[in-house]
Amino acid sequence: MDAATTTAGLSDLKFRLVRESFADAVSWVAKSLPSRPAVPVLSGVLLSGTDEGLTISGFDYEVSAEAQVAAEIASPGSVLVSGRLLSDIVRALPNKPIDFYVDGNRVALNCGSARFSLPTMAVEDYPTLPTLPEETGTLPADLFAEAIGQVAIAAGRDDTLPMLTGIRVEISGDTVVLAATDRFRLAVRELTWSAASPDIEAAVLVPAKTLAEAARTGIDGSDVRLSLGAGAGVGKDGLLGISGNGKRSTTRLLDAEFPKFRQLLPAEHTAVATINVAELTEAIKLVALVADRGAQVRMEFSEGSLRLSAGADDVGRAEEDLAVDFAGEPLTIAFNPTYLTDGLGSVRSERVSFGFTTPGKPALLRPASDDDSPPSGSGPFSALPTDYVYLLMPVRLPG
């Protein structure tokens, strides 16, 4: 029998709730659903009503998502319906109360004068969601979102290289280090959190796409709880749990070896520069208009001046000069403009500091603080401590 029409596992679930909270929860869970599910039921969201309210769940054996919302439960029970269809419907409804109930082998959804009847799927075929590991620590939700966003930008997208598609999460007591790389750039963020145990030590690799989605749209509220386990069991479940403010998700950890990244970070620079982020970003986008997609933008640094240039005679040339604080020998270096603006957008500060060694070796970008004083002399210059670095490989200069 077709899974969409079977009545097995249906209940008399009936509830009423406000559209806004329902739409937010369904949309969040639906984003975790696979676009091409291995079996049809994995495209569904499970709605479960109890005396405590309504729980909306999704799971594809890799990623799970669960959200709890307040609802008037007239009749408890569970039902499974298409997640993306339900999400599209509730987001388009007017801001009025929603009445939802099981009607035979279908569900009815009414809101204002709008009425929908949707087919159901077999609840008994739906997998059980994994249990969250023990809590490992907590941190503010806004800090979590910022830090993940800063490193996820550098993660690889090639699934044939799984070690590059993840974010390395290293935990040592109250310190967390996040790192990601696609071989062309490396982003590292260090932050402080509230560890469940002061002597906890762990290092895991988490899928960057899932973690970025959770950080970007997932947990609202004051704190996020990360669950990898506790004591000697940290990471042993092969799961990372993220929870807070009525939402929780899990993702399987990647079983791959992340590159040894610390040895890539230079301890000193032969030249350094500090410049306004917004002005530099705007100038890069402007001169890159004459460059083919992915072509280089050249940066010529000298005392007090930066000249940006791109293009060639056959496609057109562009140049722009900017003021810069620069110390060291004059330097010409070139970068992929997209990777460069990604890094500038991730430093989250008004000014950015560049550290260079040679035109053929990676440049280091970090936030420039108000306390940074322009260096003097000809170098070398020691790399200053920072909680965020973006290491970017240059591209080969012509000739």
Swiss-Prot record:
Disulfide bridge positions per record: none
Protein name per the record: Beta sliding clamp
Q: Which gene carries the instructions for this protein?
A: dnaN
| Pfam families hit by this protein | DNA_pol3_beta, DNA_pol3_beta_2, DNA_pol3_beta_3
Family classification: Belongs to the beta sliding clamp family.
Keyword list (alphabetical) reads: Cytoplasm, DNA replication, DNA-binding, DNA-directed DNA polymerase, Nucleotidyltransferase, Transferase
- Going by the entry's taxonomy, the superkingdom of the source organism is recorded as Bacteria
Q: Name one GO cellular component term.
A: DNA polymerase III complex
Quaternary structure note: Forms a ring-shaped head-to-tail homodimer around DNA which binds and tethers DNA polymerases and other proteins to the DNA. The DNA replisome complex has a single clamp-loading complex (3 tau and 1 each of delta, delta', psi and chi subunits) which binds 3 Pol III cores (1 core on the leading strand and 2 on the lagging strand) each with a beta sliding clamp dimer. Additional proteins in the replisome are other copies of gamma, psi and chi, Ssb, DNA helicase and RNA primase.
Q: What does this protein do?
A: Confers DNA tethering and processivity to DNA polymerases and other proteins. Acts as a clamp, forming a ring around DNA (a reaction catalyzed by the clamp-loading complex) which diffuses in an ATP-independent manner freely and bidirectionally along dsDNA. Initially characterized for its ability to contact the catalytic subunit of DNA polymerase III (Pol III), a complex, multichain enzyme responsible for most of the replicative synthesis in bacteria; Pol III exhibits 3'-5' exonuclease proofreading activity.
Single GO term (MF)? 3'-5' exonuclease activity
Q: Which GO terms describe its biological process?
A: DNA strand elongation involved in DNA replication
UniProt subcellular location: Cytoplasm
